[in-house]
């Protein structure tokens, strides 16, 4: 299977995929025959466990409504459920990945391009999780503005950003800008191992939204 040889690091052709449709097709192919989940397992992908564990320490309650942005095959949803959370919606660009999510795990699933405005009212969610989506050729920093918009006052935004694109794509500037404007405040920000066996590092950020 050609996907098995693909790496998520700089060697991947994925960082050359500029068009949204190309990224979608890449993941649609990867979703075939459960290859995505198998690769994540093989690569010891610790993103969901590590991120949800960090998030759980600061979450107001287990009943808050969570938006899982770029939910893929539902790995974050499975971890949220395992840690006692019970209300989450998922969104992803790839319909095939969405189709592979176990029934009933998420209350709502939607095919969404996170580089576009999210079709959602302001102040709906108690938290936004975005794990493994800020990487090569994917979702750009303005998505963070949308995450803030759809999150309630004092809600949490928890995300990982591939370290190779953190500065290159301008995530550092966007994060600082939101802090400077008083739209969120930092709860935690640290380096995560992410994919243990592939030597791909990521920044893990946890921010509290401030609505004046």
Where are these regions (language model features)?
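Conserved alpha-helix/loop element of class I SAM-dependent methyltransferases that forms part
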Residues: 45-64
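Conserved beta-strand signature within the Rossmann-like core of class I S-adenosyl-L-methionine
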Residues: 154-162
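Core SAM-dependent methyltransferase catalytic element
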Residues: 194-212
């Amino acid at each position: 299977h050609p996907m098995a040889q693909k790496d998520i690091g700089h060697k991947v052709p994925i960082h050359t995929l500029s068009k949204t449709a190309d990224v979608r097709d890449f993941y649609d192919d990867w979703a075939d025959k459960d290859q995505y989940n198998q690769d994540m397992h093989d690569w010891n992908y610790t993103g969901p466990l590590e991120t949800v564990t960090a998030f759980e320490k600061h979450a107001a309650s287990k009943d808050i409504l969570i938006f899982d942005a770029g939910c893929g095959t539902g790995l974050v949803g499975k971890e949220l459920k395992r840690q006692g959370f019970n209300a989450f919606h998922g969104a992803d660009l790839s319909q095939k990945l969405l189709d592979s999510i176990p029934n009933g795990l998420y209350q709502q699933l939607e095919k969404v391009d996170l580089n576009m405005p999210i079709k959602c009212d302001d102040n709906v969610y108690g938290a936004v999780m975005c794990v493994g989506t800020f990487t090569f050729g994917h979702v750009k920093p303005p998505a963070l503005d949308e995450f803030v918009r759809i999150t309630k006052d004092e809600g949490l935004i928890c995300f990982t950003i591939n370290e190779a694109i953190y500065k290159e794509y301008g995530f550092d500037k966007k994060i600082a800008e939101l802090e400077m404007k008083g739209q969120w405040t930092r709860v935690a920000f640290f380096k995560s191992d992410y994919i243990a066996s592939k030597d791909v590092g990521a920044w893990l950020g946890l921010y509290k939204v401030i609505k004046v």
